[in-house]
Swiss-Prot record:
Connects the signal transduction between the two-component systems EvgS/EvgA and PhoQ/PhoP, by directly interacting with PhoQ and thus activating the PhoQ/PhoP system, in response to acid stress conditions. This is Two-component-system connector protein SafA. The chain crosses the membrane at residues 19-39. It comes from Shigella dysenteriae serotype 1 (strain Sd197). Keywords: Cell inner membrane, Cell membrane, Membrane, Signal-anchor, Stress response, Transmembrane, Transmembrane helix. Residues 1-18 are cytoplasmic. The gene is safA.
């Protein structure tokens, strides 16, 4: 009986760790997206167009090599 209780507590702790890991990852992704959109907002639309064009050229040139 005692071994089963210990095993259940270990399983609960593992489940808790897994849930906390997912929560931390979601929070980090959310903060990253907020930072990206904030940077995009500060750059403005014309800057984003230039960056997108440069990035497209870079990707195309990388694929041609």
């Amino acid at each position: 009986m005692h071994a089963t209780t210990v095993k259940n507590k270990i399983t609960q702790r593992d489940n808790y760790k897994g849930i906390m890991s997912v929560i931390v990852v979601v929070l980090l992704l959310t903060l990253t997206l907020i930072a990206i959109f904030s940077a995009i907002d500060q750059l403005g639309i014309s800057e984003m167009g230039r960056i997108a064009r440069d990035l497209t050229h870079f990707i195309i040139n990388s694929l041609q090599d």
